[in-house]
Amino acid sequence: MHRYCRVGFRDEHRISHLTASTMAKKHRDDFVMTIDSDSEASDGGDSDTEQKTGDLNPDFVFGEAEETAFTGWDLDQKDVANHKDVDLDGILRSKGGLSGMIDGEEEEQKEEEEENEDNAEDEEEVNAGEDDEDLAMDGFGMGAEQEDDEEEENSEQENEHEAESEDEQEQEISENDEDSAAAIAEFYEESKTTEKITSFQALQLSRPLLKGVGNLGYTVPSAIQAASIPIAMMGKDIVAGAVTGSGKTAAYLIPIIERLIYKPAAVSATRVIVLTPTRELAIQVCDVGKKLGQFVANLNFGLAVGGLNLRQQEQQLKSRPDIVVATPGRLIDHIRNSPSFSIENLEVLVMDEADRMLEEGFQVELTEILELIPKHKRQTMLFSATMNTKIQDLIQLSLDKPVRIMVNPPKQAASKLVQEFVRIRKREHLKPALLYHLLRLVDPQQQNRIVVFVSRKEMAHRLRIVLGLLGMKVSELHGSLTQEQRLQSVKDFRSLAVPVLICTDLAARGLDIPKIEIVINFDMPKTHEIYLHRVGRTARAGREGRSITFVGESNQDRSIVKDAIKSLEEQKNGKAVSRTVDWKKVEELNSIVESKKDTIDEVLEEEKSAKEILQAEMQLEKASNIMKHEKEIHSRPKRTWFQSEQEKKQAQRTPVMQSLTKHGKKVNSKKRKAHEERKEEKRSYKKTKSDRSAPKTKAKSKKRK
């Protein structure tokens, strides 16, 4: 009997190992390569050959079947960074870049260090109390796994749509969309004096939630939190706005988690959906929610964003998490194509950055989501840094007698922000050299986080190459990057591995990147509202910060500066100064930049060739796998969308664009806006030749009489 048990034990061990090995091999064989995926690992031989010994392994212990729960996309994991991308830094090093300062900078740096010693001591005093946890940035510690074969086409379409929408947003923004002070005053009621809430205990929150709030270092509710949390806990619809960095994310997550503490434990269902305009903001919101509810039993979060693994998201949504944080496109995809995902029991709908959600790029998706969501009674909350008061937009969102909350007057920058302006005049060609000069001047050791905003993705990429060739560590963040590249850029920026981040307005909305010391506006934004969002990345949560803006000679640039100064005068806080620049030094640096033009072109060409080689390898491997698993791939149901390609293009084309593009030519934003203005204006009557000659004939007839 004893011998029989021993043999059975050994055979069971061998069988279990063979089964696991076979399943792993089958999983590898079932994998179809995509452009954004890793290369397949080669099989190193059958693992069962190692188990052919007849001896019993004394260290073998039976364990329970492990189920890996989703714990966030942790970019710090080593096994995530296997994605093949073009090594741009390697190309720059081969061209002599990223090696330090250019010739002649060493001596000047010593002088600058002596001048900046006093400033460094002041900064140490300011930063002494900044040991707080980087809460929201942990949301970027999210590992991005590669997409499988089914989602490749959808992901490419999402990336193209996002890149197009980013370009469209740069073109479509006009000052006519801004509300006047009278319209805002009419929309929001006059403020009434209420009791000031001095602690989260006064909000009557549950103990598990209070423990999570305390662990995050929250002690006193911010103004938006104190105003909105009690109303949200009453179940009323909310339209709320506050300045950036005021804690809007926690303002809606805290009442939601408090509500879910009392949910029916027997039934698992998705009860809350949080919509965000960008993937990065969705990842951040999901991570903040997990930390707030870490001590709440049976509280689950789901993430549904484009660019990340579709199959993993489907498996996660299959468990019906309580709160799903999503971007509009991927949410519609899951509702239509994931049979196990249901929103029948939805109770709360949140739209973060609501004004941007209502812009043209998200209008169609929002309408479709509102049609897909059940019509039963639900709570809807809109949170944003700015709140557009267009009545038709609020009606479309189907709000039921919403409570309107506006904390802090709109169009105000942080009180501890120093706004500096550099007048470019007719020196547009010197801007790259000026940027390098200022970066070396304000942070010679590259120990502070600096965000540089540009208007175009192409300029962001070119500046990264230029500054890299001049010896600076720089990363980029914009819509043309893959999701893995975006997350890696922010992770490097967070850890100060790369202290300078060049980005478009993609990162200007909602993202809480902590401890950013300086914001530089390389290109002036389109409106004062976008300017506030950009400079709002620094001087957050009561810290000091500085913004440096390059101002051109256009009327638009000047009006934004006037609005910023006017806002400071009304606010009676903050500071605005004109920064003097040593233009002779900038011109010397520009001559160095000009001398590297051929090198820049070589880097761009080499990068393009490397990308083509990588894509060819991926396509070759993908074709090979498709031939092996053709039947299985074609047997899977095709994913559907609520719009055809023709309907998408038609929805994006406004009547003005249709009239301007009759012959298939693309029109830039200036021509389109000029056409709109001409169409809106009443046509003035212009005298014809006969009209001008009529008075003369009348005068002659009078003389004859």
Swiss-Prot record:
Residues 36-56, 90-178, 631-705 are annotated as: Disordered. CDD domains: DEADc_DDX27, SF2_C_DEAD. Residues 674-694 have a biased composition (Basic and acidic residues). Its EC number is 3.6.4.13. Residues 652-661 have a biased composition (Polar residues). Keywords: ATP-binding, Coiled coil, Helicase, Hydrolase, Nucleotide-binding, Nucleus, Ribosome biogenesis, RNA-binding. Residues 97-178 form a coiled coil. One of its GO terms (biological process) is ribosomal large subunit assembly. GO terms for molecular function: ATP binding; ATP hydrolysis activity; RNA binding; RNA helicase activity. It is found in: Nucleus, Nucleolus. Pfam families: DEAD, Helicase_C. InterPro entries: DEAD/DEAH_box_helicase_dom (IPR011545), DEAD_box_RNA_helicase (IPR050079), Helicase_ATP-bd (IPR014001), Helicase_C-like (IPR001650), P-loop_NTPase (IPR027417), RNA-helicase_DEAD-box_CS (IPR000629), RNA_helicase_DEAD_Q_motif (IPR014014). Residues 37-48, 103-136, 145-178 have a biased composition (Acidic residues). PROSITE patterns: DEAD_ATP_HELICASE, HELICASE_ATP_BIND_1, HELICASE_CTER, Q_MOTIF. ATP binds at A242, V243, T244, G245, S246, G247, K248, T249. Residues 662-673, 695-705 have a biased composition (Basic residues). Its main location: nucleus. Residues 229-405 form the Helicase ATP-binding domain. Residues 416-588 form the Helicase C-terminal domain. A motif (DEAD box) lies at residues 352-355. GO terms for cellular component: cytosol; nucleolus; preribosome, large subunit precursor. The Q motif is unique to and characteristic of the DEAD box family of RNA helicases and controls ATP binding and hydrolysis. Associates with pre-ribosomal particles. PANTHER family: ATP-DEPENDENT RNA HELICASE DBPA, ATP-DEPENDENT RNA HELICASE RHLE-RELATED. Belongs to the DEAD box helicase family. DDX27/DRS1 subfamily. This is ATP-dependent RNA helicase DRS1. The lineage of its organism: Eukaryota, Fungi, Dikarya, Ascomycota, Saccharomycotina. The gene is DRS1.
